[in-house]
Each structure stands twice: as C-alpha cells, then as structure tokens.
Amino acid sequence: MGLSDGEWQLVLNVWGKVEADVGGHGQEVLIRLFTGHPETLEKFDKFKHLKTADEMKASEDLKKHGTTVLTALGGILKKKGQHEAELKPLAQSHATKHKIPIKYLEFISDAIVHVLHSKHPAEFGADAQAAMKKALELFRNDIAAKYKELGFQG
C-alpha cells in the first residue's frame, strides 16, 4: 500500500503550493468539509454557529484551524509513510478527546483533493491526484490502526 518515490514526489510537489498559502488552503478545505458534510461541524464547538460559507470565510478562527490541520498533515506527508511519531499524538487526541470518526477523515481527504484540484489544476493532474489519494488513504489506515489500539471504534 506504500507509495513509490515518484508518487511521493508528486504529493510533495503539490504540497509546496499548499505551503505557499496554508491558511487559505486550510480554510477552503474546512469550508468544503463543513458545507459538504454539515454533520462534521457538530464536532467543533467553536464553529457550530457558522451556518453559511460566507460566515465561514469571515472566520479567522476557522482559518487558524485550517492552518493547524494542513500544517500537521504536511508534516506527516513529508515523512513519506514513516510518520509513526507524528501520528501517535494525533490519533490519541482525535480518538480520546475529539472523538473524530474515521469517516470524517475520509470526508476531509476528499475535500483536500477537491481544493487542490480546483486551485492547482496544472500541478494536480490525474497522476498527482491518484498519489495524493493513496497518501491520504495510508494516513487514514494508520490512524484507524491507532484508534483500534486505543479502543476507539471511530
């Protein structure tokens, strides 16, 4: 299930574009997640009051959280699958404190792919999309394994 060196290179090339505007990308990803899957908003007390995409766009807190999410994910992606140290505390907090179901990680993965494709169509063609989907699936599978170790059935 691992990625080839070439696939990792495709993932990291487009991730460089994300890092140039991590806050903007993160905000768009969360807006896409929350508008496409409103049930996910219930896990975020801080954002529950945001009902429209315009309200979400105006929220500095949402942008900050988007930055946090994509910065953490970028750190994991740069490990090219060797992300045990980064993944463990993330799985712990998402399983025990936030109680985020794996399904929601699938939803945000889809949102990430959509946002990257809409913002960077030239750099995020079919091969790069397939590589990113594979990298995000690897991340989710590893989180799911940690959830199981923690006794969380997310």
From Swiss-Prot:
Pfam families: Globin. Its EC number is 1.7.-.-, 1.11.1.-. The keyword Chaperone does not apply. InterPro entries: Globin (IPR000971), Globin-like_sf (IPR009050), Myoglobin (IPR002335). Coiled coil: none annotated. It is found in: Cytoplasm, Sarcoplasm. The keyword Cytoplasm applies. Keywords: Cytoplasm, Heme, Iron, Metal-binding, Muscle protein, Oxidoreductase, Oxygen transport, Phosphoprotein, Transport. Monomeric heme protein which primary function is to store oxygen and facilitate its diffusion within muscle tissues. Reversibly binds oxygen through a pentacoordinated heme iron and enables its timely and efficient release as needed during periods of heightened demand. Depending on the oxidative conditions of tissues and cells, and in addition to its ability to bind oxygen, it also has a nitrite reductase activity whereby it regulates the production of bioactive nitric oxide. Monomeric. PANTHER family: MYOGLOBIN (PTHR47132:SF1). This is Myoglobin. It comes from Lepilemur mustelinus (Weasel sportive lemur). The lineage of its organism: Eukaryota, Metazoa, Chordata, Craniata, Vertebrata.
